[in-house]
Design a protein with these regions (language model features):
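Gly/Pro/Ser/Thr-rich low-complexity, intrinsically disordered segments predominantly at protein N-termini
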Residues: 1-191
Length: 191
């Protein structure tokens, strides 16, 4: 029988101090830092398109899109960094965490699917302000949208394709899915 040894848990504030000094990309599982890997060029293109589309539509609305560097506190002091989010609450420029995200976006990578679809869905479900969780595929132009009317409601799932528009009534915006994938080069389908 083998036993995995784990360092003693650290606090969220210790995590932020450590991560600042380290300079790498890390999430916090509520006990220990968890390394985040870099993404592909397609991942970067999708994130850039997402950020530009949201910023254009939300300018002057009172809601603000934020990128990958601001965290969300989830279950048990865990800190998650997603690819984008929208908040309608003004957040201090020096803050590490966004207190009231409304829409959260994750762009899948070859290794993040399980975490993004299962673990983060559960954790984001514990954040009362989140009304929509949008998961963008990286290998095709498919989008999974999970939405709920309130914090105590179950998620409702919908699948979108490049011909659809992502409607986000909670922030008064909609974006054609094809816009997220502009310039993205997909590998040819296997025959």
């Amino acid at each position: 029988m083998s036993v995995a040894l784990r360092d003693p848990c650290i606090s969220q504030s210790q995590f932020f101090a450590w991560a600042q000094a380290d300079g790498g990309r890390w999430e916090f599982d509520g006990c220990q830092p968890v390394a985040m890997t870099g993404g592909t060029v397609n991942h970067s293109r999708i994130c850039g398109n997402l950020s530009a589309a949201l910023r254009r539509r939300l300018r002057g609305s009172g809601c603000e899109p934020l990128g990958q560097d601001a965290g969300i506190a989830t279950v048990g002091d865990a800190v998650r960094y997603r690819d984008a989010l929208v908040t309608c609450t003004r957040v201090s420029g020096g803050a590490y965490l966004v207190p009231d995200p409304v829409v959260v976006f994750e762009v899948l990578s070859p290794t993040s699917g399980r975490t993004d679809r299962i673990v983060k869905l559960r954790e984001y479900g514990a954040v009362a302000s989140i009304r929509r969780y949008v998961i963008l595929e990286h290998a095709s132009s498919g989008v999974t949208v999970l939405s709920r009317a309130g914090a105590d409601d179950d998620w409702t799932a919908a699948a979108l394709t490049a011909e659809d528009t992502l409607a986000m009534p909670e922030i008064g915006a909609g974006v054609p899915v094809a816009e997220f994938y502009d310039g993205v080069e997909f590998a040819p389908a296997a025959e």
